[in-house]
Every structure is written in C-alpha cells, then in structure tokens.
Amino acid sequence: MRHLKKGKKFHRLAGPRRAFLRNLANDLVRAGKVTTTEARAKAIRPMVEHLVTIGKKQTLAARRTLLSRMQNEKVAMKVYEELAPRYSSRVGGFLRITKSAKSRKRDGSRLSTIEFV
C-alpha cells in the first residue's frame, strides 16, 4: 500500500526521476519562469523553495549543499548570490504556480506556469 508516500513517480525509476526534477529546477532558476504540466510544477515547487531557503543561510556549507544538489555551478551561484538576498526578508512562498487555460494538444495535460514571485 502507498500510505504516507510523498511525491509523484512520473513513470520513472528513482535515478532518472531525480535527474528529471533537478533539470527542471535548474531551468526554472536559470529562466525565472517555466511552463510545464501542473503535476511537474507542483513537484518542483518544494524542492526549489528549499534550495532558496538553504541559500539564505549564506555559509560555506550552504554553498556546497547547493552545488551538490543542483550539480550546475552557474545555477547554484545564481541561487546563492541573486535569489537568496532577494528573498532574505521573506519566510517562504518564493514561487507562484499559475494554472493556464490551455492544455497540451497531444495528450490534453493541463499546463501551468511556475515562476518566482
């Protein structure tokens, strides 16, 4: 039974799923805004918010944690140097998910836009 299990599987094994979510999070940090399905947006929201919270600590350990989690130095430094100071006075809720009226043509999935507030 699947009681108290968090997160979606997205029809992937654990390793490819982690890589998929990490790449989507990297794209969001790099661009500031990503249009994707509603389920994917909901899946990366807590992950990215936690990364911004880690970056707000402004310590060497926080910087190394970001580097290990994101595995992209430019993106990790953007979180550490740009996003964390921008949200220093904010406790949480760094991201906004806006549901779109459009759906994908090929499979009818509902699209959403996830962006930084």
Tell me the role of every PLM-derived stretch.
Residues 1-88, 102-117:
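Ribosome large-subunit tunnel/peptidyl-transferase-proximal elements
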